[in-house]
Structures are given as structure tokens and as C-alpha cells.
Amino acid sequence: MQIVEQMKDKALAELNLVKDKKTLDDIRVKYLGKKGELTEMMKLIATLPNDEKPKLGQAVNIAKQALQEAINLKLANFEEQELNEKLAQEKIDITLSGVGQNQGSLHPVTKTLNRIEAFFKQNGFAIEFGPEIESDYYNFETLNIPSHHPARAMHDTFYIDETHVLRTHTSGVQIRTMEKQQPPIRIIAPGRVYRCDSDITHTPMFHQVEGLLVDKDVSFADLKGLLHAFLNSFFEKDLKVRFRPSYFPFTEPSAEADIECVMCDGKGCRVCKHTGWLEVLGCGMVHPKVLKAGNVDPEKYQGFAFGMGVERLSMLRYGIDDLRMFFENDLRFLKQF
């Protein structure tokens, strides 16, 4: 038993001198490996008298356990030391200036849409959507524009086939809403629309918001009041607004709403063509035939509708003079918003 104790003390003494993990592992193998010195001692048990065997086995196990615990402690110290050295080398200097990141922003059309939707939601309007590939029935027929009607010449339409088009307005959403919902109805229908036109003020695809209100005792005065409040809210100033008689097949009477030029405050400039006024939207009282197409009794209910181009309003709000800039993905332009 004494030789086992001496071997343990020798191994522990060697451990105290270890300076690295490799040497530590060499000592582990030397004493605790398959052919280690303490492991070999276990083979001597078979040669001892029966009363001595348990004593040697117990002594060897105690020595192995003590040595293994010492090795584990030494290994933990080495690993902690390595970690501290690594942390010291890789520490973050919080006094250094941070690295800037490019900050994204909303597209001006999206910002304008959000602004329009926020106003009408605050005034009790729901938001409805419809398909961009629309049937001739919903895009024209139900809106008092039959196939022979000259008003179809007002729309440069993309035809998918004989009965389907890329919608030229979101008015079809109004009919779909009236079909599934009884008055009172208050909705706006934002979305993409398509017309075969492209120049400085027109693109083949643009965004439009149309609105519909159907209820009892609705008047043109209600329409004027709502749109005047909207325009003041959108441009954040008390604007002069005028309504000029106009023509739309789906409303009667119909009007165009003009605002005092936001660029020159009505004094006259290139943007307003020196008239002092800017056309911003169309509106009118819903035609009885359109109400009937939506299964609404025109003898019992009245309604008004309005429509506006989102890009048009965005150009006026942000002072943009070319519609095509919205669709060119030029970061020099987009970063300004």
C-alpha cells in the first residue's frame, strides 16, 4: 500500500510543475491510461493473498480518484486562463465610434397612401380591395359605361381578353362592396390601376384611391365638406377649394375639385400654369343606375363617390415635377424621403 501512496504523491508533485495542457495530458496517460502506472498496479491484485486484495484495490482507487480530481482542477484552471486571455484580446472598446448603417425609409407613394388611409379611417371609412384583373362587367358595365358608350374612349385600356381588362380604376370595388353589404356604406378602395399612357405626367401603372359613401339623406354638401376637410388635413394648411362641374358616367352631378396652388399660394406659377389652381380629384353623387347595379334602391338611398391619383397628390405634397421618378428606383431620389 505504501508504494501506491508514494506513486500518488509523485504524480501530484509532477502536476504542480505542469505549465500547459499537453504536459497535463501526458501525466494523465502516464498514471491513469490503459498502461498507466496506477492502472498496472491493479494487475498485482491477482498475485496477492485474499485478505490483501481488497486493501490494494481500495488504495489504488483512492489514489486514482485523487489524481483525477487534481488533473480536472488543473485543466479547469488552464481553460479559465485561456478564456481570460482570449477575452482580453477580443474585448470591445466601447469608447470607439459606432459604424453607421444605412437607414431605410418608406417610398413617397406609400407615405402618401398611408396618409390618405389614416384620414378616412378616422372618419369611419373601411378599406376594401379588389382584383387588378377585372371583368368588363365590373370595370365598365356596372358603372354606367356600356360597350357602345363614348366614355370608354376616355380610358386607354389594357385588354387581357374580350371580357377581362387590367382595371382602369378601383371603382369596381365599390360595386362589389354594395353587392355584399347593405347601406350604410363607407369605404375607400386603394390600389394599382392601369392605362395605356406614358409621359411626364402619366405612367402605364399608377395608384388610385376611390371612395364611396351610401346612406339615407346624403347630399353634395356632405361630399364637399368631407373632401375640403381631407385636403386641408393632407396638405396641412387651410386651403381654398373649388368644385367645377364635370362629367363622369357613374356620377350625376359630377365635379372636379381644385385647390389653391400649394407651390405659389394661388399667385400663379409654372406648376399651376399661372391659373393659381390645381386639379386634385374627381367626385360626384352616385348615379342611380350604379346604385341599382350594386343592388341598392336609389329611391331609398343616395351616395357620393370620389377618386384621386396617389402619385398626383404625392407630387404636389413633396414638390416632385416628374411622375416617372417614382418608378425608377433611384436611391438619390428615394433617400430624400
Swiss-Prot record:
Its main location: cytoplasm. It catalyses: tRNA(Phe) + L-phenylalanine + ATP = L-phenylalanyl-tRNA(Phe) + AMP + diphosphate + H(+). It is found in: Cytoplasm. Mg(2+) binds at E252. GO terms for molecular function: ATP binding; magnesium ion binding; phenylalanine-tRNA ligase activity; tRNA binding. GO terms for cellular component: cytoplasm. Keywords: Aminoacyl-tRNA synthetase, ATP-binding, Cytoplasm, Ligase, Magnesium, Metal-binding, Nucleotide-binding, Protein biosynthesis. Its EC number is 6.1.1.20. Binds 2 magnesium ions per tetramer. InterPro entries: aa-tRNA-synth_II, aa-tRNA-synth_II/BPL/LPL, Phe-tRNA-synth_IIc_asu, Phe-tRNA_ligase_II_N, Phe_tRNA_ligase_alpha1_bac, Phenylalanyl-tRNA_Synthase, tRNA-bd_arm. GO terms for biological process: phenylalanyl-tRNA aminoacylation. Pfam families: Phe_tRNA-synt_N (PF02912), tRNA-synt_2d (PF01409). Its cofactor is Mg(2+). Belongs to the class-II aminoacyl-tRNA synthetase family. Phe-tRNA synthetase alpha subunit type 1 subfamily. Tetramer of two alpha and two beta subunits. This is Phenylalanine--tRNA ligase alpha subunit. The lineage of its organism: Bacteria, Pseudomonadati, Pseudomonadota, Gammaproteobacteria, Thiotrichales. The gene is pheS.
